[in-house]
Regions:
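N-terminal cap/recognition module
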Residues: 68-89
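Domain-length cofactor-binding catalytic modules of enzymes
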Residues: 2-34, 41-48, 54-62, 68-72, ...
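Acidic active-site catalytic centers that drive phospho-/nucleotidyl reactions
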Residues: 50-51, 78
Length: 307
């Protein structure tokens, strides 16, 4: 532990990660060490958040600079899982009626809408149809998923700030669409690494490609293809949350005073950082971090820490 900087280091074969925490979760540390021992991230700057914990495919609270290789399972199946936040002001809400509306009108769990939402822009619809066809999916079913909550830790709630303002907060992602994209490209990654392993003459290079189905990586044209599909999934998730918010606000007969989204499971193609259970916090960037049902969420602005 480096007391002054409040982090400890986890080393692997190719890289060393900084973990900004005073506590060691050994299961999560093993996952971090495995990441640092994967050639996909040998040139990345890896930083782990204070609330890190074990995850499926990767440790949660993971950030790394995007280099030439990518493991689809790092971001995982719920591409662009994140938060939509709308400030409503000091309004009165009938929570019983709102609860009834949400339960009856916003599909949750494995359910989706009966019809495709007319709110979906035509250009995004075309992109979703294109990716669906490539993956052998029914495009209509994927489109019907837009405007649905999903399951797990996804939620819709009304929060109240200390000043009395109420906020509509929605936590959801890319539904089955993101899952299918991840699974397709992770399979591609395994096949690619197997091929490269067989072709490699150099022993060290052979070791880099000697990976299993869950931690194989993509590079070159295959990585670019994954990024292209991922960008569509990220649009899907943003739109999914936005449409749910619009429907709820229409029911409440309210207009949002301000709205924004905070994503915590995605690749940011502007700052080229992979985030898994972590958010962007550039200087003055508005962010929302969900805590739990007791404490609600944190509204904050980024400090732009370069580390």
């Amino acid at each position: 532990m480096t007391a002054q900087n409040n982090y400890f280091l986890v080393e692997g074969k190719y890289n060393t990660a900084r973990v900004f925490s005073q506590k060691r979760d050994e299961t999560a540390v093993e996952q971090i060490a495995a990441i640092c021992s994967n050639a996909a991230y040998k040139n990345s700057q890896i930083r782990i958040m204070p609330d890190y914990h074990p995850g499926l495919g990767s440790v949660i609270g993971f950030t790394a600079t995007l280099e030439n290789r990518i493991i689809p399972n790092t971001v995982g199946v719920d591409i662009n899982c994140g938060m939509h936040c709308s400030r409503l002001g000091k309004v009165e809400i009938n929570f019983r009626l709102l609860d009834q509306f949400i339960r009856s009108s916003i599909p949750h769990g494995f359910k989706h809408n009966q019809k495709i939402s007319p709110r979906i822009p035509s250009d995004i619809k075309e992109e979703i149809v294109r990716v669906s066809k490539k993956l052998g999916l029914g495009a209509d079913n994927q489109l019907k998923g837009i405007g649905s909550l999903g399951g797990g830790n996804h939620f819709i709630e009304i929060n109240q700030a200390e000043n009395g303002d109420k906020y509509l907060v929605i936590h959801s992602g890319s539904r089955n669409f993101g899952l299918q994209i991840c699974n397709y490209h992770q399979k591609q990654a395994y096949q690619y690494c197997r091929q490269q392993y067989k072709k490699a003459a150099d022993l060290e290079l052979k070791v880099e490609y000697d990976l299993n189905k869950s931690n194989s990586f993509l590079e070159g044209k295959l990585a670019a293809e994954y990024y292209q599909d991922m960008k569509v999934a990220q649009k899907y998730a943003d739109l999914n949350r936005k449409i749910m918010a619009e429907r709820i606000l229409e029911f409440l007969e309210l207009e949002a005073l301000a709205s924004f989204q905070t994503r915590h499971n995605y690749i940011n193609f502007e700052d080229h950082i992979i985030r898994k259970g972590a958010v962007s916090a550039h200087q003055d960037e508005k962010i929302l971090i969900p805590l739990n049902m007791r404490d609600g969420s944190i509204l904050a602005r980024g400090l732009g820490n370069p580390d």
